[in-house]
Amino acid sequence: MGKTHACTDPHHHVHDAAGFVAAVERACNERGLRLTAIRARVLGLVAQAGRPIKAYDLLEQVREGEGAGAAAPPTVYRALDFLLANGFIHKLESINAFVACHHPNSAQHSVPFLICDRCHSATELEDASIVATLDAAARGLGFAPQAQTLEVHGRCARCARAR
């Protein structure tokens, strides 16, 4: 199996949200995409969250910052859809929440996540062999994978020590 690296510090958190948004803006420019103000705002909130964040919480924060009429739910959902489709954020399906992608300049990729059921942290694992093994196993069974979501629930190291 390939080398596994966890992207976490100590949890899935981008410490320089403005720098992260700027990196995504550069990636958008390189790809001919447009990072609108609302997309940048939603991306910044996801990056600052320090934990997986739900769409409703994002909507609430956008409204707090810009006024109650500033953002309707479809606006935030469209921003999330854009950020997801272009690989700038990940959706944790099992908890219906979002986290920033630690590789905004790379092409879309599937990564496994470790999700702590106690503190709700999410750790992005970098191990291409895990994804490749799943893909190969599926194809070996005649299955044509379209997308992969691998989420492992348990306790992070900090919570496991705190029993």
Segments from the language model and where they lie:
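Pre-recognition alpha-helix immediately N-terminal to the DNA-recognition helix
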Residues: 40-45
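Short capping segments at the starts of secondary-structure elements
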Residues: 48-54
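N-terminal leader segment of winged-helix/HTH proteins
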Residues: 1-34
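Non-DNA-binding regulatory cores of transcription-related proteins
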Residues: 85-163
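A short acidic, leucine-rich amphipathic alpha-helix
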Residues: 57-63, 76
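Basic amphipathic alpha-helical segments that dock to polyanions
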Residues: 76-86
